[in-house]
A protein has these predicted regions:
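Post-cleavage N-terminal segment of exported redox proteins
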Residues: 5, 20-21
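Catalytic glycan-binding domains that act on GlcNAc-containing polysaccharides
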Residues: 48-266
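Bacterial N-terminal signal peptides that target proteins for export
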Residues: 1-10
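Bacterial N-terminal signal peptides
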Residues: 9-19
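Mature N-terminal segment immediately following signal peptide/propeptide cleavage
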Residues: 31-50, 54
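Cleaved targeting-peptide boundary
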Residues: 22-29
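Short, compositionally biased low-complexity segments
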Residues: 21-22, 138
Length: 266
């Protein structure tokens, strides 16, 4: 009888006992259900609790995530085309309005973290249209699928462990939705970055990246912790441009953020 034919409670008890196994990846969805108990052992050994393990066992293989992972066309565009496709002019226009409407808030963020409003607004606009669309894919299933898939398993498995720990903490739920690669909230944090750099910006005692204040504080904290130098430039060749590279590895994305941020702040 395959592992996924056992009652859920039996699988969970097996996952919470014994040493972790090396968890094999696969390029098709056929072995996903058999993979989950093995991944659960690895997660438990990494410190994931019962709530996180239960969430992992409830996931399903996400064909939508695999499709998106194989079809990231926009990062292959020229800078001009990329900015056109991603709506740079609208982001700049909206960014200026939002900065003016929330001047004290962005000034306080910059005073605390050293990151200017334009950078945060450019990222916010680029990632989710200023929170208008934060995704429609189950986060845990998306990240688990990418951990299971051989293409980038080593990269995504730590993010899966982090997502399960976020569930243990109550920062997300098993039903939380995000982008196709499991990114979370207003600025689309991967779970590992959310766990490491997330900030309870509004002081309610809970990290929630779908909350605007938490998301902006967390984004600024990420950049500062990655080496952002307050007052230094962020255009190509300037000290803080390398920190934008930490946010997204695509050159056109980095260049677009730098251009939009300067125009928002200008």
């Amino acid at each position: 009888m395959p592992p996924h034919s056992f009652p859920k409670a039996v699988i969970l008890s097996l996952c919470l006992a014994g040493p972790a196994l090396a968890t094999p990846c696969s390029d098709t969805g056929g072995q996903y259900e058999s993979w989950k108990p093995l991944m659960a052992e690895e997660a438990q050994a990494a410190g994931v609790g019962r709530r996180g393990i239960e969430a992992l066992m409830a996931t399903s293989y996400s064909k939508a995530t695999i499709g998106a992972d194989r079809n990231q066309k926009s990062f292959r565009y020229s800078l001009e085309k990329f900015m056109q496709v991603r709506g740079a002019d609208a982001i700049i226009s909206q960014g200026r309005k939002r900065k003016a409407q929330n001047a004290d808030f962005y000034a306080a963020i910059e005073a605390q973290y050293g990151v200017p409003a334009g950078v945060l607004l450019a990222i916010h606009g680029m990632e989710t249209g200023f929170g208008n669309f934060m995704g429609d894919t189950n986060v845990v299933s998306a990240i688990a699928t990418l951990s299971y898939d051989c293409r980038r398993s080593d990269f995504f498995t730590p993010h899966l462990i982090a997502a399960l720990k976020l569930i243990d903490m109550g920062a997300i739920s098993p039903q939380t939705v995000g982008a196709k690669h499991g990114e979370l909230g207003h600025t689309q944090f991967l779970p590992g970055n959310a766990l490491t750099y997330g900030v309870d910006g509004n002081g309610d005692g809970q990290l929630d990246l779908t909350d605007f204040v938490d998301a902006m504080a967390s984004t600024a904290n990420f950049l500062r912790q990655k080496g952002w130098r307050p007052g230094a430039g962020y255009q190509p060749g300037e000290p803080n441009f390398a920190v934008i590279e930490e946010w997204n590895a695509a050159t056109v994305y980095q260049q677009a953020i730098a251009i939009m941020a300067a125009r928002i702040d200008g």
